[in-house]
């Protein structure tokens, strides 16, 4: 499956499960353009609500993307934060890497 088809499938899945105002950001080698065929798909899910994420949020928002990866025979690795949690990580290298190389693929 071609890269754009995979991104389209990820967007379609996100559209079916994500709450309004949330964002899905592709980062890592797939975003930088240096991915190999066996490279995974790193996704940051930013939920548009305050507070903290929990197991129910992972099951509701991240798990459908993991399942999509299984169906497409690719590895999709979603990381889930609320906007509030994400802003608290502004001092981390991870935050800066995602801000620098990340591509918003759904909002």
Question: What residue ranges belong to the model's regions?
Answer:
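Short beta-strand->loop micro-motif that forms the acidic, two-metal-ion catalytic signature
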Residues: 41-46
């Amino acid at each position: 499956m071609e890269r754009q088809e995979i991104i389209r499938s990820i967007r379609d899945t996100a559209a079916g499960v994500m709450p309004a105002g949330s964002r899905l950001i592709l980062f890592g080698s797939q975003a930088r353009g240096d991915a190999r065929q066996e490279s995974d798909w790193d996704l940051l899910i930013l939920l548009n609500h305050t507070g903290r994420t929990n197991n129910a949020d992972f099951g509701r928002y991240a798990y459908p993307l993991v399942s999509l990866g299984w169906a497409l025979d690719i590895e999709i690795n979603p990381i889930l934060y609320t906007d509030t949690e994400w802003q608290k990580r502004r001092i981390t290298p991870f935050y800066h890497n995602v801000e620098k190389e990340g591509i918003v693929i759904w909002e």
